[in-house]
């Protein structure tokens, strides 16, 4: 009787172990890795961030400002991750941002003030729409 129980217990352990490995193999095969694709707006905002880092450095050093980056205008019609976010509020904040950016190049004597106004517009919009990048955006401020 003891031998029978020992054989039965051993058999159950082997069967249960085998089932687990089979199910983990299925899970590995079923998992699909989906690559995140940035929306046109997300990519534009990443580019604007980099451009503004460089601009901040030029303003801080007192270098020449250069020309307004015309690709910033795409903010008005770039495809967003969630199209419902492209509402009146977003359009107003985008206009404030563009106006501040244009003023940097039109009035370089007050570039720091105009630059920080542009950063303000970004933060105000992101407080309503997508708060994730706010800490990063705040690093753009010129003291």
Residue spans for each PLM region:
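N-terminal hydrophobic targeting signals that begin at the initiator methionine
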Residues: 1-2
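Bacterial N-terminal signal peptides
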Residues: 5-12
């Amino acid at each position: 009787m003891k031998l029978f129980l020992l054989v039965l217990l051993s058999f159950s352990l082997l069967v249960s172990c085998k089932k687990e490995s089979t199910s983990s193999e299925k899970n590995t095969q079923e998992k699909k890795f989906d690559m995140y694709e940035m929306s046109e707006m997300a990519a534009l905002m990443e580019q604007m961030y980099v451009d503004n880092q460089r601009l901040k450095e030029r303003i801080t050093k007192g270098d020449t400002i250069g020309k307004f980056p015309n690709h910033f205008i795409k903010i008005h019609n770039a495809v967003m991750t969630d199209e419902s976010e492209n509402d009146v509020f977003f359009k107003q904040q985008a206009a404030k941002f563009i106006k501040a950016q244009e003023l940097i190049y039109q009035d370089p004597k007050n570039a720091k003030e105009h630059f920080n106004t542009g950063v303000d517009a970004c933060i105000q919009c992101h407080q309503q729409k997508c708060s994730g990048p706010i800490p990063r955006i705040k690093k753009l401020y010129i003291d």
